[in-house]
């Protein structure tokens, strides 16, 4: 029988928690996150500003909260170290860099868990000057983008993390025009229920379509408040998380 050390979960662990994430100032964009936690679930986000790029991740790690946070703390260290390595030296091939970053996080999840550990995630690289978004959605709920053409869906394009040690993901690219908004939200928010129905992606889409929010923070608050209102005070069984990235309309004049 093969001796594979990463398949043996440690009996006892000094469980850790991830460090708080800072929101870097940007001249042409805004980013915000709103979070409403439950007793279970492992929603986690982090971001770094490296040169003219914002590198960010949003994960939904399966399992009980304490161990999910321990996994998140490990992933955070890997994310910050590898992102600095991959995105600091110009020129940067953003698609290759985000692919390598996701591969490193996938391996970290499996190694710290000692076995397969189902986790979905979204990893993105937003170039502030160009407005390009290079991303991998590893089994995560579909991201939504609102721009002058309406609301488009960025569907998951890769396998969930934590399942296969050497799985690689193909990065995708889109452009956020000035005034465009990117919205990421956790499965817990989409599945928030009242007595009859889930909140669902179509309600998220409706909120985004009709939103008059002028800031990323305002958009996050609006989406979360609609989800909580939909629940009519029912118990929250999973984390509700929302991340919004808004490219400011002023970015158009900044580039002229």
Regions found by a protein language model. Name each.
Residues 122, 177-178, 190-256:
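C-terminal catalytic subdomain
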Residues 1-182, 232-256:
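… and, occasionally, acidic/histidine-rich disordered N-termini of signaling adaptors
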């Amino acid at each position: 029988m093969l001796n594979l050390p990463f398949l043996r979960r440690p009996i006892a662990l000094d469980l850790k928690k991830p460090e708080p994430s800072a929101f870097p100032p940007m001249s042409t964009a805004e980013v915000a996150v709103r979070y409403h936690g439950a007793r279970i679930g492992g929603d986690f986000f982090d971001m770094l500003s490296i040169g003219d790029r914002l590198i960010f991740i949003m994960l939904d790690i399966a399992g009980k909260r304490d161990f999910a946070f321990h996994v998140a703390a490990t992933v955070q260290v890997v994310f910050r170290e590898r992102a600095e390595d991959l995105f600091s030296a110009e020129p940067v091939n953003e698609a290759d860099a985000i692919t390598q970053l996701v591969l490193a996080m996938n391996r970290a999840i499996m190694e710290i868990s000692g076995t397969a550990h189902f986790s979905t995630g979204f990893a993105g690289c937003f170039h502030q000057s160009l407005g390009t978004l290079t991303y991998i959605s590893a089994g995560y709920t579909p991201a939504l983008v609102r721009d002058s053409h309406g609301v488009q869906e960025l569907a998951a394009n890769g396998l969930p993390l934590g399942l296969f040690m050497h799985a690689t993901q193909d990065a995708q690219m889109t452009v956020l025009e000035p005034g465009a908004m990117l919205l990421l939200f956790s499965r817990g928010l989409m599945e928030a229920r009242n007595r009859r129905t889930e909140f669902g992606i179509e309600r998220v889409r409706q909120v985004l379509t009709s939103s008059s929010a002028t800031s990323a923070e305002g958009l996050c608050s609006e989406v979360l408040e609609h989800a909580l209102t939909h629940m009519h005070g029912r118990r929250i069984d999973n984390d509700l998380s929302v991340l919004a990235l808004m490219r400011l309309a002023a970015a158009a004049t900044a580039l002229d």
